Each structure stands twice: as C-alpha cells, then as structure tokens.
Amino acid sequence: MDDVSFEVSADAYGRFMGRFSGPLAEQFVDLVGVEPGQRVLDVGCGSGALTAVLVSRVGMGRVSAVDPSESLVEVVRTAYPSMDVQRSGAESLPFPDGSFDAVLAQLVVHFMTDPVTGIAEMARTTTPGGVVAASVWDHAGHKGPLSAFWSAARSLDPSAPDESDLPGVAEGHLAELFAVAGLTDVASSSLTVTVEHPSFDDWWDPFTLGVGPAGAYVTSLDDAARDALRDRCRQTLPNAPFRTRATAWTALAHV
C-alpha cells in the first residue's frame, strides 16, 4: 500500500477525511452485518474511524487492525491499548489463514499497491463462510467528497491528478477486482453520507494539511497558485453554511 501521503498526524487525517469516513463507517458495518461474537479485521485502519465502529459492535478484544502508516498505527494503538494493531500493508497481512469472520477495508483498495493481491489476502485471512468487504469513493463519477476540489483544480490545471483513474473508483470496478482476486457472487452497492460545513474555511483548511493526493497537490503549489485554487473553490461552493454529499461504492463477498 502507498502510504506516502498518509504519514501524517491523526488530527490532520481526521480533519481531512474523518468527517466523511466516520459516518460512512456506520453504514458500511451495517451493510456487512458485523455481529457480536465475530472476529473482525480492519485493513488500512487510518486513524480509526472504522475501527471505532467495529469496537462498538464486537468489543476491543475481537478487533484487529493494520495500516502501513506508523503514525496512524500508533494513534489506534493508543486509543485501543489491548487491541492487536500492526503496521502492515494489505498485500501481506500478518495473520494465519481463516483468522477472521469478517475482513473490511474502508477507503483503502484504491490506494493499495496491488489491489488484487490485497483483496486476495483479505479473503485468505477470512474463515470459510465469512465476509470480505470494501468501500471506495466514487471519484470516477465525481460524487466523492473531493469532487468539488478536483473540479476546481482541473479548471485551473487540466493535468491535476483528480483520482478518477484509481482502482475501484468507477462503478462496477471494485466488484471486478474482487472477482479477479478469486471471490464469487460479489454483491455491489453504494452508500452516501452528508457532511455539514459551517464555513468555507472549515471545508478548505483540511486540504492544506498534506493528506492524500489532494493534500499533496495543494502543498505542491506556490502561494499564487494555491490562492487561485482556494478562490476557485470558494466560487464553486454554495455560501456557508453548506452541505456536501459523498458516495462510495461497495463490494461484498462470502468466502
């Protein structure tokens, strides 16, 4: 997994993506049907948005989590000191075959170095009859949480890397990756969250923290280009307070 743009503080990560990933996690866990008594794994846990929901459903002792970012692993370890949290990419999970009843990856597959291998590893560590599930933002359909940002960026710089070509972000592609990884009877769906922004700065400032491709793009700009992008985003968005909606594709399969 590519952690170059995610070796950041938990505060920065939370301000940038946590406002969307928190509410998404509740819906995602409901979709998967995680139940008390199950052993579950959070692949690419980040600062712990999905982890927190899993802990609330099955208890700390039945959740494990991995992430390639050491700083984010330490955040989750601190929050859940008795939980098994390890630094690892998805492509080589440090668990025996069939260790978990459910293995989930929220907003991770599109950043895996090798998504097919990562999904296959998720399946390997799932017990027979268990569930493998993933979600990714609809960047290709321009319905993700960063769509307004990338639309503004590309209006000024057509070469801006808007994440629309990442693995799994187009409708149906996440399910295709599951199939290539060897999973069958893959169910696809979508989930949508709505986030309130009390001011433009509340929306904009997290983009300046260097998180993910969008944050890396902003920090790569000189002051004039950054100010121009900020102004273009302000022109694009409604007057504050305003809401943004974000849709994620999901794929789910039983092993």
Feature annotation, model-predicted:
Residues 116-117, 123, 127-198, 214:
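Conserved catalytic/acceptor-binding region of the Class I
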Residues 101-115, 138:
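A short SAM/SAH-binding and catalytic strip from SAM-dependent methyltransferases
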Residues 39-93, 102, 117:
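Class I SAM-dependent methyltransferase SAM/SAH-binding core
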Residues 92, 96-97, 114, 170:
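Acidic/polar helix N-cap motif
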Residues 4-7, 13, 95, 100, ...:
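Conserved hydrophobic/aromatic "anchor" residues
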